[in-house]
Amino acid sequence: MPLIIIAAGVALLLILMIGFKVNGFIALVLVAAVVGFAEGMDAQAVLHSIQNGIGSTLGGLAMILGFGAMLGKLISDTGAAQRIATTLIATFGKKRVQWALVITGLVVGLAMFFEVGFVLLLPLVFTIVASSGLPLLYVGVPMVAALSVTHCFLPPHPGPTAIATIFEANLGTTLLYGFIITIPTVIVAGPLFSKLLTRFEKAPPEGLFNPHLFSEEEMPSFWNSIFAAVIPVILMAIAAVCEITLPKTNTVRLFFEFVGNPAVALFIAIVIAIFTLGRRNGRTIEQIMDIIGDSIGAIAMIVFIIAGGGAFKQVLVDSGVGHYISHLMTGTTLSPLLMCWTVAALLRIALGSATVAAITTAGVVLPIINVTHADPALMVLATGAGSVIASHVNDPGFWLFKGYFNLTVGETLRTWTVMETLISIMGLLGVLAINAVLH
C-alpha cells in the first residue's frame, strides 16, 4: 500500500505540473501534504515534515547554491569563463571538448558534493556552448555524468567514503574497483548518451549566463581565470586528504576542515575573484556587487523548487516507507551484491535521496557481510550504483538539473532520469563483472 500511495503521488505531481502548469514549488508542497495524509500522518506531523524537509535541504544547499551562483556569475561576467572555454576548445578541439569536461567533472567531483561541482562548472558549460555553437545538453551531460559517477564509486568523495566506513571496506580497494567501473560507465552515460540529446535545443536560463562575447583585451589570462574556479576544489581536496591521514584533533586538519567546507571554500573563492577578476580588470566594487546581486535573483525559483523536492522527500522518509521496503527485502534470497543494489534502488525511487537510500541500505544489509563473507568494497559500489537509479520528481537533484538546463519536467525525465539510470545499471554490471573475475 505505501508504494501505491507514492506512485499515485508522483502521478498527481506530474498531472499538476505538466497538465495544469502549476508552479513547481507549489505542486511539490501540495503533493507532499497529500501523500503524508494518505500514508496516515496527522496534520502536525505532515506540517513538521514539510518544514523539516525544506529546512534540511536548504540548510545544506542554500549557501552552496548562493555562493556557487555568485562565483559562477563573476567568472562568466568578467570574461574568465570565456577564456577557459576558448582555451579548452583550442586545446582539445570542438569534437573532443566533451572529453575535456568529463575529465574536469571527475577531478572536481572527487573532492566535492555533486551540487557544489554542478553549480561551479555550469558557467563553463554555458560559455563553451556559446563559443562553440554546440547543443547545451550535448556539452553539459558528460560533465554532469562525471560528477554523478564520482558520487557513486570514487572515494575520497564523501558519499562512497561514508558507505565504505559502515561496511568497513578498504578505501584503496574500493577506489580501485570504483575506477574500473567508472571508465565505461561515464563513457556510456556521458559522451555516448549525449549524442542522442542534440535534438533538445535549449539555451541557458536568463540571468545565469552572460551572452556577451568579450574581446581578447577584455578577458583575463587563462591562469588568472582558472585560479578562482579551482580554489574550492583545492581546499576541499586538501580537507579530504587531511581527514584520511591526520588525527581528528590535529590543528592542520581542523583548519582545513573549516576552509574546506564547501560553503566556506566557495566564499573564499568569491573574495579572491572580486579582486583577481573584478578589481584587477578595472571594475568598481559597485559594479561587482551588481553582478553578485543579479546572480541571486536568477536562482531564486530554482532554490525554492529544490526545497519543495526536499519537502516531498522528507514526508516519504518520515512516513516510514523506508522501513516498509527494508522489511520487505529482509526475507529475500538474492545474492548480497544484487540485494544491495535492489534495496538501494527501491529506496532511491521511493524516497528520492541517494544519500538516504545508500545509508539505509548499508544498515539493512550489513549483517549479510558477516554471514556470506561478501566483498565489502563491491558491496559499497553495488549500494552506490543502486542509490542513483531513476531519479525523478522526489529528488532535489532532478529539479536542480531541470532548472539549470532550462528543461520541462518531461524533458528532464527523458534526459536526467535516463542518464542516472544508465549510471546505475552500468555500475551494477561492473560490480557483477569484477565479482565474477575475482570469485
From Swiss-Prot:
InterPro entries: Glcn_transporter. Pathway: Carbohydrate acid metabolism; L-idonate degradation. Its main location: membrane. It catalyses: L-idonate(in) + H(+)(in) = L-idonate(out) + H(+)(out); D-gluconate(in) + H(+)(in) = D-gluconate(out) + H(+)(out); 5-dehydro-D-gluconate(in) + H(+)(in) = 5-dehydro-D-gluconate(out) + H(+)(out). The keyword Lipid biosynthesis does not apply. The chain crosses the membrane at residues 12-34, 54-76, 97-114, 119-141, 171-193, 219-241, 254-276, 291-310, 323-345, 349-371, 378-400, 415-437. One of its GO terms (molecular function) is L-idonate transmembrane transporter activity. GO terms for cellular component: plasma membrane. Residues 1-11, 77-96, 142-170, 242-253, 311-322, 372-377, 438-439 are periplasmic. Transporter which is probably involved in L-idonate metabolism. Transports L-idonate from the periplasm across the inner membrane. Can also transport D-gluconate and 5-keto-D-gluconate. It has been reported that gluconate uptake probably occurs via a proton-symport mechanism in E.coli. Belongs to the GntP permease family. This is Gnt-II system L-idonate transporter. The gene is idnT.
